[in-house]
Amino acid sequence: MTILREWRGRSKPEKADATLNHYLTKLKPIMSTAPGFIGASISSRDIGGLVEFILISRWRDMDAVKAFAGHAPEKAVLPEGTENVLEDSDNFVRLFEILDEV
């Protein structure tokens, strides 16, 4: 069963570019080489003075998620330096089983 992993974080507007760059240079390389990684997307929106980012990744199965995230697969994986670009972030992710895709 394919797993969808959802995480959210928020930055000040002036740090939005740095937040995206942090994802592209720090987290994306780790995820993209992890066994069982299928793909990911990052999106953003303005939410009243902050920019919210949502990262959605897809994984082959729960074993792949655990290999990436460790023994607590619902715990967020936040590379060093994340605290420098985000105002706040979710410490936990939401995990879903993908039932169908187009």
Question: Regions from the language model: what does each represent?
Answer:
Residues 32, 66-69, 87:
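Alpha-helix boundary recognition
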Residues 15-17, 63-65, 101:
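Residue-level signal for secondary-structure boundary sites
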Residues 2-9, 39-71:
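Short, well-ordered beta-strand segments in beta-rich or mixed alpha/beta enzyme
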Residues 41-51, 77-102:
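Glycine-rich beta-strand-turn "strand-cap" elements at beta-sheet edges
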Residues 21, 54, 69-71, 79, ...:
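Short amphipathic alpha-helical leader/targeting segments
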Residues 15-39, 73-81:
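Short amphipathic alpha-helical segments
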